[in-house]
Amino acid sequence: MGTTVALTLVCVLVCGIAFAGAVFVLMPGARDRGTTASAGGSPTPDGRGPQPRPNQSPAPSVPSSTEEPLPGVDTPATPPPSTPVANTGTYECPGFSGIQLPVSMVLDDTFAWGDDPPYKVGTGSGDINWRSDPYRKPSWYMWLHSLRWLGNGIHAGQRGDRKTLTHVLAIIHDWVQDNPYSWKGDVGAWEATMHRTNVLLCARQAVLTGLRVSSLPAQYAWLDKSLVDHAQFMIVNWSGPSNHGTDESIALFGVGCTLKRPELKKLAVDRLTQAITTAIDPQGSTNEQSVGYGMFNYLLWGRATTALQRCGSSPGPVIAQRRAALSEWLALATKSTGELQQVGDAVRQKPTGAAGTALDYVASLGKRGTKPSKRVAVFDAGYIFGRTGWGETRPFAQESTYSIRYGAARRLHGHDDHMSITYSSHGRDVLIDPGHSGYQLDKWQAWSKSPAAHNVMTIPSADTAAVETRLLRASITPTWESYSLADSPAPGVTRKRDVLVLKDPDLVITLDRGQATSNQRYETLWHLAPEQKVTVQSPTAAVAMKPGDKSKTYLLQIPYQQQPPADGITVVQGQQDPVQGWYYPDIFHRQSAPVVKFNRTGTNAAILSAVVPTATTEAVTYKTRTVSGMFFVDLTVGARKATIRVLPDGRLSRIS
């Protein structure tokens, strides 16, 4: 593979989602992995791939794979304490996360990762073949070099099991001998550096505790030398102000604290101080364009704060301020179902609460913590989060929640999801994001990041690209919100979307308008949750319902300026060529899920949609009328009524 693909694999190795029981936790990442799938489904660079690190030289490739990676966990189960911790002058072993192996496997030099069979990588004496790559999976190779799989052996050694401690140290020493500084020529060893640094620190602590000594015995001097080498590697190859760079800075601080090297501590603190203002903006938005990575950022910076305080360095006020803002951001980004919005690279997960915060409020479904001060918020970074309430007049889970994306073009862990809407109501997901297909550069990732995987108007006949989307106006009232957005996704093509979100009855109205200099295919897509069965009743109406459920969803294409054609509504599900109609609850599982398309062909299109969740016993009807150039829709949902006004410029509002 060429240098570009090799550099892309650098991120494939470290940006992941871990599976530990039923908990999914995001790993840090620092670079974009945009791809375009070839006809055969194999990955090719699309020109928006990873940016080289400062002074980065070409790195050799690691064999690619069509399998989805399964990296290890790198976040604590609960957030670090919000109150200052005692200064003990030490760096605490951060643990080994979700890829620990039984001690018996460690003693047998056998490594296992993901769902692949265990593989004997050594002789049984700690002599490891560090070039082992039996399954040709970049992440398998990187986690082998991380040494995190030695965690249970290190714990055993710390408890006094000298046989196991000796074997673990033999494996670590073998890595040090077989991978001399600088190991930058090996992508897997390179990208595992920050993880391996922490393992070395944990092993050093296990030696002191297991042998009941206060200073490192001379026979293990190589361990401290290797820690210095790892620190030097991270100094020279810092990833910058990103999640990955922040993790490196914490590990660098750990070396400085452990070896009493104040210059390393200072450099780490300086880098953290620089990174925090990029990682989290003053409004609480992260630079990763992902709600899931927002949760990771919250935990990561809590870990940084604790590490600094425990070893006598002040984290300063900015980290606490930005984390507090991010806590509010994440609370607003939590659906009424109690899960985070799956926006950007994000798996299905619940937020992790911190005592007394707004995040704790949503994590407990309103039972504790502090209720967020806002019901709806518009963030400059390109996020709109809204809800009908916080459970004041109806159960928390029965509120309706939504998200809308706009802003800067896709980067890092973002998707081409501008103008997309997610929506939850009646205790369930109605409009979904595709989720996170993983880090393998294949047709599935290309689709999951594309506009076709989101609830937007797409122009599949045009050569579209990731572009900035402008929020032109926003109106927030007690019973409705409206937004106007615009962009130009392709040369000679403009796209506008007006959105109206109602409370009582809870529903979403959108007006999509596309205009081009030549005939185009326009499709407004509505991605529904898996197991929904869609019945197309006419070119203007479809109904979706999960068998046995107590609610259903009406999807209405209301005639406006144009009469929908005979094939005005089509449904796609579980399609592989081209990919369409799927959902990823996590990177390991893919489920078919229906996509309802509202279709047009021509130089322009005007598609007025209504997405109306109801009880199964309720009916939805509407009438339209035009008065003085204004278009009105009189909607009836069960016994509730609402009148929607469409102004000539497309603005939507509720007038009753």
Where are these regions (language model features)?
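Aromatic-lined, polymer-binding surfaces characteristic
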Residues: K137-R323
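CBM-like, beta-strand-rich accessory domains located in the C-terminal region of large
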Residues: A346, S437-S656
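Carbohydrate-active enzyme catalytic cores, enriched for enzymes
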Residues: F253, D281, S285-L431, T477, ...
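N-terminal export and membrane-targeting signals
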Residues: M1-C11
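A residue-level signal for conserved active-site and pocket-lining positions in enzyme catalytic cores
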Residues: D46, W149, L252, D512, ...
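N-terminal low-complexity, Pro/Thr-rich disordered segments
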Residues: A22-V85, R348-R368, S656
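Core hydrophobic alpha-helical transmembrane segments of single-pass membrane proteins
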Residues: C11-A20
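Extreme N-terminal leader/anchor segments
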Residues: G72-T123
